[in-house]
């Protein structure tokens, strides 16, 4: 179905009837009438429609909107009055997403596969995430059928799009200063309430929704957004639009905030400023971006609360009840793996609906919610909706690129020193930048030929989204039986197809600070502690763990995890000499990092010397094709970093995919000494011997 209208920036009325009975005039609603409502949330779907891994060409029952659909159906059966909302990052994140946006872009007459499914599931509304901007404003305008009123951004006509309102409150055009999407919408729902005498009555409830994205989109997608849009702070935007929503008749106001929780003092530039929306007069807060579970999961054997959430002040955040300064809040993880549910009770008092806060219940419900063991079945109606797109993606994914590998490239132990899935990325980036400089006719660029070129890349798929979320390319490869690489593999090695390669010119002091920031991923280990210690307490920001490399392994460094963050990097050398503060380096990286993504000191866009039109993923693909074959000796064993050797009294563990101790043995990672039991998230606990 095509969305043939541009919604008013003031308010949108979306009528959804839950009863054939005539709606009663609000004035006729008896005092004390009770209305029970469940707000349902998905977030960070990232085009994970089916329970399928396009990189590994295998089923993955831990994810997929087709199973979330089963959770939605169950929640609707339990709660007759529901509002289904999404918190953004829908269109990008799998090969299916890249196929529909880049390899074979969906036409105006078509509709994105994920939007087709969301339409079928009858979503009531959605926010916008930072990854919605990855493919550019013209593509986003087309697939949402929205006129942004920005010069040079023009959709080709009335295009296939979601059937529900999309809202974004804090992104405006630089010329118009008006929101490019509707800043809010009012969804008029007809629900069944209970009068004081116990009888039923049909009532109308106006649910107002607003959407927010991190201001950092201006850094992360600068190439698409610079000079076209600007981003306002989430709190300032909410303070503008909450009163408008109330004045337009919103009974409930829900913030769809594509950001996590940060208890730091508020700043309009905060990436995760959602906590500060709780003081703006909203009634409910739906969270995203961080790919975490909030509140703590309730099913039997539920995963432990992420360390970053557990560290939030209890005076502001109740991680059990799901309250942020008293406002109910939920984050449904990512990839369709959970459904956020906020059950609210409203009482009709003095002519308006009043939330009975003490009766609110919040849950981030997972696939095993019934008994902690049984995974819900997929909704059989979903797969047929996207069968054509699924088959086309598989055909695309399995095309040969003409290169073989004699070794497995995996990220199971990337946080224990393995570089088998990272070195090839760094080699590709160095090769690109050196060739760029060598062939440049720009006199400034040409003058950099004598400066060492190094590279950094992060293990993007290293457990952030659960124990199945690990890069693993060519798992069966051996010297005797090389593995033929396919189109899908560069995306497994470098997940983000939207990143473009950039290079920055830095000093040795900058390099040291960069490495110190990366090393914050590790916990501070107490050698005298007898209790078990996690080497990596949270994988939520694993994309900020940059691993550096130079040709011939000329760059080496050590990490001392017994020291406080900021004081961990020692023995930093290049070509056998200690790196000093004034040394010059050129670092091949991506536009996200070069532009300031991750808040690395001094890396803020001002040191960028090369802005490539080529995506990092494409650079990796081209490099692989040029090699004809890659080998462990040349492309997978250049371990540039190690831990400072430390004897610990108690066990230090690293959580990774189960059953991979043989991988560590093959890699020669002797510090990975044994595989232990599974934790409640399904990760295996590997013992790390820091003395080796």
Please provide the spans of the model-predicted regions.
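Sec-dependent signal peptide recognition
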Residues: 2-10
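Structured loop/turn residues at beta-strand edges in well-structured enzyme cores
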Residues: 13, 121, 205, 248, ...
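C-terminal motif of bacterial Sec signal peptides marking the signal peptidase cleavage site
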Residues: 15-17
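Intrinsically disordered, low-complexity segments of exported/surface proteins
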Residues: 19-26, 612, 633
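Acidic, metal/ion-coordinating pockets
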Residues: 21-354, 358-360
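Solvent-exposed loop/linker segments at secondary-structure transitions
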Residues: 30, 35-38, 43-53, 83, ...
